[in-house]
């Protein structure tokens, strides 16, 4: 099984799938914001940044998945983004499951001064005035944080499988004179 995932990681379609899934979730969030009128909270914006990291990881590996540097850079970014997105989604769920005055998120995203994404791309990364504990949307009884926990858990699971597969040695190519 690991050799199968190693072979997948050496080809572009698998990385295109990662980028497409992340882009689909990103576009879905933007659709909820701009078309359905749901105002994103700060945690939603942070989760959106994690999805952007997954998208960038897929695009980096699309350049040349056979080259060690591109593949490992994409793997590191994939793992970090999936882990960070999962931890942010769990924290966001905690805000909604246990609302209290002392368990709240910030009012404005705290991006580094060198990369103020909320100022550079306000239509994508600017948060509204919504409290993180407010549930604005549900599907099948689950809110946005629960669905993102599922999504980031799957991203993390497949990252771990692909990461472990990188240490699998390739099968030697036996060449026959008569073949």
UniProtKB/Swiss-Prot annotation:
Q: What is its main location?
A: membrane
Annotated InterPro entries: DiS_bond_form_DsbB/BdbC (IPR003752), Disulphide_bond_form_DsbB (IPR022920), DsbB (IPR050183), DsbB-like_sf (IPR023380)
Bilayer-crossing regions:
15-31, 50-65, 73-90, 147-165
Q: Which residues lie on this side of the membrane: Periplasmic?
A: 32-49, 91-146
**Gene this protein is translated from:** dsbB
Traced from the root, the source organism's taxonomic lineage reads: Bacteria, Pseudomonadati, Pseudomonadota, Gammaproteobacteria, Pasteurellales
Q: State its role.
A: Required for disulfide bond formation in some periplasmic proteins. Acts by oxidizing the DsbA protein.
Q: Which residues lie on this side of the membrane: Cytoplasmic?
A: 1-14, 66-72, 166-179
Q: Does the keyword Disulfide bond apply?
A: yes
Query: What membrane topology is given?
Result: Multi-pass membrane protein
Q: Where in the cell is it found?
A: Cell inner membrane
Its family? Belongs to the DsbB family.
Organism whose genome encodes this protein: Haemophilus ducreyi (strain 35000HP / ATCC 700724)
Pfam families from the UniProt entry: DsbB
Disulfide bridges in this chain: 41-44, 105-132
Q: What is this protein called?
A: Disulfide bond formation protein B
Q: Does the keyword Membrane apply?
A: yes
Gene Ontology biological-process annotations? protein folding
The Gene Ontology CC terms held by the record are:
plasma membrane
A molecular function (GO) held by this record is: protein-disulfide reductase activity
In terms of superkingdom, the source organism counts as Bacteria
Q: Which UniProt keywords apply?
A: Cell inner membrane, Cell membrane, Chaperone, Disulfide bond, Electron transport, Membrane, Oxidoreductase, Redox-active center, Transmembrane, Transmembrane helix, Transport
């Amino acid at each position: 099984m690991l050799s199968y995932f190693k072979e997948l990681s050496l080809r572009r379609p698998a990385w295109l799938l990662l980028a497409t899934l992340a882009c689909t979730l990103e576009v879905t969030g933007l659709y909820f914001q701009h078309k359905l009128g749901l105002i994103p909270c700060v945690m939603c914006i942070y989760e959106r940044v994690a999805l952007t990291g997954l998208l960038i990881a897929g695009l980096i590996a699309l350049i040349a998945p056979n080259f060690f540097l591109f593949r490992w850079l994409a793997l590191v970014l994939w793992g970090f983004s999936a882990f960070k997105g999962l931890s942010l989604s769990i924290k966001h769920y905690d805000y909604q499951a246990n609302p209290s005055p002392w368990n709240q998120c910030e009012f404005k995203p705290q991006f580094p001064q060198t990369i103020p994404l909320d100022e550079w791309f306000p239509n994508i990364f600017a948060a509204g005035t919504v409290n993180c504990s407010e549930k604005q949307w549900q599907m099948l009884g689950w809110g946005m944080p629960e669905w993102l926990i599922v999504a980031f858990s799957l991203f993390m699971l497949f990252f771990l499988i692909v990461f472990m597969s990188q240490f699998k040695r390739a099968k030697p190519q036996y060449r026959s004179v008569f073949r």
